[in-house]
Every structure is written in C-alpha cells, then in structure tokens.
Regions:
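RecA-like P-loop NTPase motor core
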Residues: 2-87, 91
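Short, charge-rich binding segments
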Residues: 90-96, 118-121
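Short glycine-/polar-rich loops that comprise or flank the Walker A/P-loop
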Residues: 24-25, 55-57, 96-99, 124-126
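Activity-critical C-terminal alpha-helical subdomain
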Residues: 107-143
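A residue-level signal for conserved active-site and pocket-lining positions in enzyme catalytic cores
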Residues: 41, 102, 136
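Acidic, metal-coordinating catalytic cores used for nucleic-acid/nucleotide bond scission
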Residues: 34, 69-72, 104-113
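Short loop/turn segments at strand-loop or loop-helix junctions that form parts
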Residues: 59-66, 103-106, 132-133
Length: 143
C-alpha cells in the first residue's frame, strides 16, 4: 500500500540545524544620584517583565561603593564608564555589543555651558540620559 503522506525536508533551511545564537545586549546604568535614580532603575529591573522589556536584554545598575558615593560629578561617571571599557572582562562587558548609559542632571550646568559641552563631547560613545532640570521632576511628570 502506498504511503498516505511523504515527509521531506523541502521546507527546512540548512541553518535550522546549526546552533542558534539569540541577540543579547547588556545595558549598564551609571547614575549621578545615589537615591532617586537608583530606586527608579532598581524598580525598573524588578518590573521589566510587566513593562514588556525583551528578556534577551539585560539591564544592570552599577552602584557606587561607599568610598565613591561622593563622586557624583558627570566627569567621574565618564571615568567609571571608560574604566569599564578598558577592563571589560572585569565587568563581563562586551564592548562590541553592550552599552553604557550615563544618567545625570543638567541643572548644575545652567551657568557652566562650556563645561557641559565638554562633558557631552567626552561622553560621545555612551548613551546619555540627561534630565533637565532634575531626575525628580522627570519622575513627577511621568509617573
């Protein structure tokens, strides 16, 4: 008796049998503030599933140590970010794929426009999340 159905592989690709590599990117957040910004990004990480953030995207918050708590100047944030790029294995950071996000307020640069321009120029390779005048106002307007 003839087979009722003949199965073939006409609809499979040769790449279907090879190991699949899913896209994966890590975002490292470095914040100027030590209270509000840290709370916001911790909460964002906690509710990422409810927000529909792709599970293949890793969000990490780099918190400053006790000795670094007073180093909140955006120049210091850029130094921290550059240190990550110089020693990526220490932070499990892939310089070709992962991104660093620097979060700081612009309100302290109202009178220091040239310093602000220098900071923007020094941070070109990073993603900047600048709140103007401050992060707390951003939260009030968006929550």
């Amino acid at each position: 008796m003839a087979a009722m159905r003949i199965y073939s592989d006409w609809n499979t690709r040769s790449s279907d049998n090879s190991e699949q590599i899913d896209p994966y990117r890590k975002y490292l957040f470095i914040c100027e503030g030590e209270n509000t910004e840290v709370w916001y990004f911790r909460h964002l990480i906690e509710i990422r599933k409810e927000l529909g953030i792709n599970p293949l995207i890793d969000i990490q918050l780099l918190e400053r140590t006790e000795e670094d708590k007073t180093n909140s100047n955006p120049k210091k944030l850029i130094e921290y970010a550059n240190a990550i790029i110089r020693t990526p294995s220490k932070f499990n950071f892939d310089v070709n794929r992962d991104k660093i996000v620097l979060v700081f307020d612009a309100d302290i640069y109202q009178e220091k426009l040239e310093s602000y321009r220098r900071i923007l120029n020094d941070a070109k390779e990073f993603i900047l999340a600048i709140s103007n005048p401050c992060f707390e106002l951003f939260l009030l307007l968006h929550v």
